[in-house]
UniProtKB/Swiss-Prot annotation:
SUPFAM superfamilies, sorted: ClpP/crotonase (SSF52096)
EC identifiers of the protein: 2.1.3.15
Top enzyme category: transferase
Gene: accA
Full protein name: Acetyl-coenzyme A carboxylase carboxyl transferase subunit alpha
Cellular location(s): Cytoplasm
Organism: Blochmanniella floridana
């Protein structure tokens, strides 16, 4: 049993484990190849059918678990596949450099752009260094500095959202967490360049919103976006964290539900089984959508761009 796999993935993993064992057997005894290949093909078909069955009926809570999957690609993973010549920029020029947010200049199909996103970290050491993707004020100030730099040089901004929320520690509060987020919200409404935001995992509360005020808001199929985590909501409403699955359902945190509510623009499809199963395919889907969005926004004059962005967020809550 793979402890990094989710409960509903385990039946699929068992079949894939059998396939892997049979492949090793072929490697050791070529004479068995013909019979074993038939068995492998049968198991592969069974795996696809089972995966389709499971993933066609996921609950909101299961999607939330997928959004947090240990193997799910992060911002730097997508940057490597989508952008060329990425050059990371560091520091807020006030306090320090927050590793929970990464950003820098890259090229999208040879066009210079600014890329900013949350980065959670893969192993324990990196998770600690990046504070599990929970940014402190200096992270949001860094993001704002890069956004203003992008405006100065007329670079489109692409943001990738993947955070449980802004860091709630005492130090962060003392250094101005709330005002750092507020300044980002205010600034992003007035930047006179295209801003395209994509939720790739968790979109948690103000920590997500601080870099997701844009002209286009996209979500990967198995990502989530909410004012509070399902566990947090359950703890407040029912005083019981075990009610998190119910909270996830009631809150409407999934991409398709948020699309219905007109809170996001596009749901980007993921490969069968989720983004962690095929990062290349997922990256192609994201890049395709980013290019489509950019073509649309490039056609707008500055005044129209800003007016449309303002109206977009003023219409939140009116379905």
């Amino acid at each position: 049993m793979d402890l990094n796999c989710l409960d509903f993935e385990q039946p699929i993993l068992k079949i894939e484990s059998k396939i892997h064992s049979l492949m090793k057997l072929i490697h050791h005894d070529k004479k068995l190849a013909i019979n074993i290949y038939e068995k492998i093909n049968h198991l592969k078909q069974k795996s696809v059918e089972l995966t389709q069955k499971i993933f066609s009926n996921l609950s909101a809570w299961q999607i939330a678990q997928l959004a947090r999957h240990p193997y799910r690609p992060y911002t730097l993973d997508y940057i490597a596949y989508i952008f060329d010549d990425f050059d990371e920029l560091s520091g807020d020029r006030v306090y320090g450099d927050d590793k929970a947010i990464v950003g820098g200049i890259g090229r999208l199909n040879s066009r210079p752009v600014m890329v900013i996103g949350h980065q959670k970290g893969r192993d324990i050491q990196e998770k600690i260094r990046r504070n599990f993707g929970m940014s402190a004020p200096e992270g949001y100030r860094k993001a704002l500095r890069l956004m203003k730099l992008a405006e100065r040089f007329n670079l489109p901004i692409f943001t990738f959202i993947d955070t449980p929320g802004a860091y709630p520690g005492i130090g962060a509060e003392k250094r101005g967490q709330s005002i750092a987020i507020a300044k980002n919200l205010r600034a992003m409404t007035t930047l006179n360049i295209p801003i395209i935001c994509t939720v790739i995992g968790e979109g948690g509360s103000g920590g997500a919103l601080a870099i997701s005020v844009g002209d286009k808001i996209n979500m990967l199929q198995y990502s989530i976006y909410s004012v509070i985590s399902p566990e947090g909501c359950a703890s407040i409403l029912w005083k019981n964290v075990q009610k998190a699955p119910l909270a996830a359902e009631v809150m409407g945190i999934t991409a398709h539900r948020l699309k219905q509510l007109k809170l996001i623009d596009t749901v980007i499809p993921e490969p069968l089984g989720g983004a962690h199963r095929d990062i290349v395919s997922t990256s192609i889907s994201i890049k395709t959508q980013l290019l489509l969005d950019l073509v649309e926004l490039d056609a707008l004059q500055e005044e129209k761009l800003l007016t449309r962005r303002y109206q977009k967020f003023m219409n939140y809550g009116y379905c």
